């Protein structure tokens, strides 16, 4: 059964792919092509533009405040790791160590770094606020798309930290110790679209129609029914056994690429933390009967569309994360959840309210630039707007294999973030201090 029709002509590259595949492919395959194909994909080709004048806005594209608020959390985690390693930061940051070739002992790893704006802002914040820590740290950019990597290299020429670009497979060959940041990355992993036909869950596929007298157009059609091996997954999400409130035609997404992504991420980190920042809903809300067509949406030039088949390769395709699926996949991949919060709550805990208040009081000897202050105020409020970026969720994970540092080894930097000293050596193995963004503001 056809569930959606797109009236746009089918690009020749996609038409040939579909013909070579027998006429149709799972939606998951189509989404991967539309986003990550090196020549035709929105990300793979580098066609997509991020920012106020681009296709969509992200938190770092609103200005440096997001990175400035996030930096203390990342610095705290990096300092904890330094203590776990028994690393003396003063010695490690000294001239003898600086002269050594090769990777630095700590890494800030960003996956899917977009334009490179957040990586640059974080590197600058670390170098300014925690110079000893920054001297022991490098930026590792995990970017599979050549078009985006080229733009990141240009942007990060100004980075105060050394930068390396690696694919996930290469990082797994030489794992590092550090913090992994996945900001608006997992929502671009290809999802599986499924549809209830009244008796079975069916995988949705993408094909093209060839009606006489009409241009070719893309369609979503029902494919094979899901086998019994998928019932445990469906049951864990509340999709099995069938609920009569979900009538024929009810459709949604599954996230099969989360588990391999998280496992790959774990393979590249011998010891560390992981911070995922993305749109997310609990399974109860994601798969609520009243959500008739999932969360899949397309973005281009600040316009949102509910049609994922529109001009393939020219639109960003994104779907919310299911927080239950994310936490389960992380656990299976060797990560342990430290906690989660909405972005609004996280940024308030990290000092956003104080930053807003500070806009009213100019630095001694400086005049208050009202226009600049109002623009920054608007950007800060957008970061916590519950109808927008404030609805993002932050998920903090740690590797279960991370050992406690031997007592007395390692020295954290003198300019640690506020709060208890990170990861004191007296803590029992396996226990971690509460991340800063999970503390009450």
What do these predicted ranges mean?
Residues 234-441:
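Long, Lys/Arg- and hydrophobic-enriched amphipathic alpha-helices
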Residues 43, 188-191, 284-285, 405-406:
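Short helix/loop capping segments that flank catalytic or ligand/cofactor-binding pockets
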Residues 146, 186, 281:
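Short, glycine/acidic-enriched loop or turn micro-motifs at the edges of active sites
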